[in-house]
């Protein structure tokens, strides 16, 4: 077998492969003989069909199947011989497969790029510094009280924080529009769950009162036919209710199933959970910043096959999150995910190179610590740990996450790090919101 390799780009190769006719004939004759032993033809007993008859009737189809198999086998031999690492499926095009002649075919493939990492000292990141204060715990306890609040009907004008029960119909001009009506809708004033101007238009209304308000839909509203449009809503208020918060006492604490039903025990549990959430948020922000920095200082040509894999993964993720059961992820256009997919594929190549360059291996002690920390959020931590340790697929995901943490540590050794102090609420916000808070401070 002869192989020639042409480099058409840093991530593309063209292989021209020639297989001797004798090897092809041997494969064809072997397949014909196998077929003769199993095929049924009228006038012949099973297994007694002459090879010449099989060749005459089925020879062309058998030869085509044999040629396809030889091309696949020869392709694998060729990439092993030439030490080529494909990044995706090959495109195989036969050039000559005439009987009696050498089989010739061309293979076009994408390969993994050679990655040369830039100096990590060029990476600049902010490391968030924050802690949980007593005031933060008080705020969280107040949130718990609100989540367990009851609503009591009142005979007064509605105010911010009240819950109103309303019927409404929306109009564009004189025509009611689809999706713009509801009956018995419960709305907490000040929650900002409706478009701007809707909630403020109900402030001060009493039960039984009717109001007509004018609003303008935002330019970025999800419904295309309503973006930027002026609309009128006719609203009937059937009830105004005020929030009745439960007392923060031992009776309230009993709802949470703690071993010790005291306010002090609840404060301790709330603080522990907040500190866990805060630490996870800080680690996540730092990891994301380091990975963004790693990507920004390195140029890598990304094989389209890797981008396509990420597009498929993002499609499935979006389908699970928004589509519900039975939703066909392939309906979502690839263009929606192309940019993010390319970023992820590039980052994956860079992380792999860091692991390879620094010879990083999964730290089993860190895997155990990762599992123990994660399991603390569950009622039976040991059961969670045992589940992961006994499930190879789940354990592999944890090991991958730990290896990413080790990459983060390696990048931190040389990156330029600036500490930024944030309060708890700002520290746990997504990156963009936290950056805005930091700028305002």
UniProtKB/Swiss-Prot annotation:
GO terms for molecular function: peptidyl-prolyl cis-trans isomerase activity; protein folding chaperone; ribosome binding. PROSITE patterns: FKBP_PPIASE. GO terms for cellular component: cytoplasm. Belongs to the FKBP-type PPIase family. Tig subfamily. This is Trigger factor. Transmembrane segments: none annotated. It is an enzyme of class 5 (isomerase). One of its GO terms (biological process) is protein transport. Its EC number is 5.2.1.8. The gene is tig. Residues 161-246 form the PPIase FKBP-type domain. Involved in protein export. Acts as a chaperone by maintaining the newly synthesized protein in an open conformation. Functions as a peptidyl-prolyl cis-trans isomerase. It catalyses: [protein]-peptidylproline (omega=180) = [protein]-peptidylproline (omega=0). Consists of 3 domains; the N-terminus binds the ribosome, the middle domain has PPIase activity, while the C-terminus has intrinsic chaperone activity on its own. Pfam families: FKBP_C, Trigger_C, Trigger_N. HAMAP family: Trigger_factor_Tig (MF_00303). It is found in: Cytoplasm. Keywords: Cell cycle, Cell division, Chaperone, Cytoplasm, Isomerase, Rotamase. Its main location: cytoplasm.
């Amino acid at each position: 077998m002869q192989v020639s390799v042409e480099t058409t780009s840093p991530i593309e190769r063209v292989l021209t492969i020639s297989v001797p006719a004798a090897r092809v004939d041997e494969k064809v004759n072997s397949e014909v003989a196998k077929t003769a032993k199993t095929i049924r033809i009228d006038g012949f007993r099973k297994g007694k069909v002459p090879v010449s008859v099989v060749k005459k009737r089925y020879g062309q189809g058998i030869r085509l199947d044999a040629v396809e198999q030889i091309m696949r086998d020869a392709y694998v031999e060729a990439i092993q011989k030439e030490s080529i690492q494909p990044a995706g499926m090959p495109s195989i095009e036969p050039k000559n497969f005439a009987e009696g002649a050498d089989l010739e075919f061309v293979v076009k493939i994408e390969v993994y790029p050679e990655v040369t990492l830039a100096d990590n000292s060029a990476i600049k990141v902010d490391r968030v510094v924050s802690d949980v204060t007593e005031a933060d715990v008080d705020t969280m306890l107040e949130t718990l009280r609100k989540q367990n609040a009851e609503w009591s009907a009142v005979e007064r004008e509605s105010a911010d924080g009240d819950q109103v029960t309303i019927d409404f119909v929306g109009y564009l001009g004189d025509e009611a529009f689809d999706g713009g009506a509801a009956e018995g809708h419960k709305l907490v004033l000040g929650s900002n769950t409706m478009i701007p101007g809707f909630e403020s238009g109900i402030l001060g209304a009493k039960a039984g009162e009717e109001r007509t308000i004018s609003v303008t839909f935002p330019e970025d509203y999800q419904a295309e036919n309503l973006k930027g449009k002026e609309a009128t809503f006719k609203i009937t208020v059937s009830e105004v209710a005020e929030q009745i918060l439960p007392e923060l006492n031992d009776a309230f604490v009993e709802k949470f199933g703690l071993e010790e039903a005291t306010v002090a025990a609840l404060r301790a549990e709330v603080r522990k959970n907040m500190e866990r959430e805060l630490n996870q948020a800080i680690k996540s922000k730092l990891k994301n910043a380091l990975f963004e920095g790693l990507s920004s200082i390195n140029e890598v040509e990304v094989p389209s096959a890797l981008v396509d894999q990420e597009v498929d993964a993002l499609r499935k993720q979006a389908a699970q999150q928004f589509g519900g059961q039975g939703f066909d992820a392939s309906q979502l256009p690839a263009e929606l995910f192309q940019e993010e997919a390319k970023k992820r594929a590039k980052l994956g190549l860079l992380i792999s190179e860091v692991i390879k360059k620094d010879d990083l291996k999964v730290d089993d002690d860190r895997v155990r610590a990762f599992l123990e920390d994660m399991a603390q959020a569950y009622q039976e931590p040991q059961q969670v740990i045992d589940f992961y340790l006994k499930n190879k697929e789940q354990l592999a995901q944890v090991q991958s996450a730990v290896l990413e943490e080790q990459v983060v540590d390696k990048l931190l050794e040389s990156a330029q790090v600036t500490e930024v102090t944030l309060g708890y609420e700002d520290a746990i916000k997504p990156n963009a919101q936290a950056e805005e808070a930091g700028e305002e401070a």
